[in-house]
Amino acid sequence: KVWREPDAAAGIAWLQYIYWIKYGDKKYLNATRQCMAFLQNRPQKEGTFYEIMMPYGAYLAVRMNAELGTTYDELKMLNWCFDGNNSDRDGWGVMCERWNKYDVHGLVGQKKDEQYAFAMNTFSQAAALVPIVKYNPAYASTIGKWMLNLANACRLFYADEHPRNRQSSSIWEGDPQHVICYEGLRKDLYHGNHFEPFQGLLLSLIHI
């Protein structure tokens, strides 16, 4: 099986666009267009979101449409960042549910099989997509609603929101003010976990 991370095109496109802005060399803009063409020509059903880079491609689609008059399919690329329907990593997107009594709407991670949300993926996606409202204010209401949910749910990455028996590193005493977040949040330790040696304990994890 060939390992594929198609949203690498989004990450490279963003880098090349920033280089073009900084240095003015058209070769960087041409490289950006080549990467964006790959995303533009990919069918909607073949979502590209692998883990962290696709939001930068969606951001760039909105920005280039505003700055250069291109006609990239913004909604297609934005939906890839949220809906979890991806050809090479199905389920990676934004949570839209409650886990037991906890509201996890807005967090980013594996929303289907493992049901595993990650702190840095959540923070990174917010950083990439919030700025699109500068280039297309029509997204302001939707992005604002997502950010309200995200900000509310992000507290669940921190130890003081959970009893010790739901934390993988509750014995660590180096952060008495609870300002360092856990890496991830899982619906439970067994849901979608096919690796028996790790059942019952995963590093840097809170389970609900």
Language-model segments: residues:
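Conserved small/polar residues in nucleotide/adenosyl-binding loops
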Residues: 206-208
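Long, well-ordered core segments of solenoidal/helical folds
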Residues: 1, 21, 25-47, 72-107, ...
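Carbohydrate-binding/catalytic loop surfaces
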Residues: 1-3, 53-72, 94-118, 163-203
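Well-ordered alpha-helical scaffold segments within catalytic/enzyme domains
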Residues: 2-3, 10-24, 55-69, 113, ...
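Extracytoplasmic catalytic/substrate-binding loops of multi-pass membrane glycan-assembly enzymes
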Residues: 8, 50-51
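Catalytic-core region of carbohydrate-active enzymes that cleave or remodel glycosidic bonds
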Residues: 76-87, 104-189
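Phenylalanine-focused residue identity feature
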Residues: 38, 49, 59, 82, ...
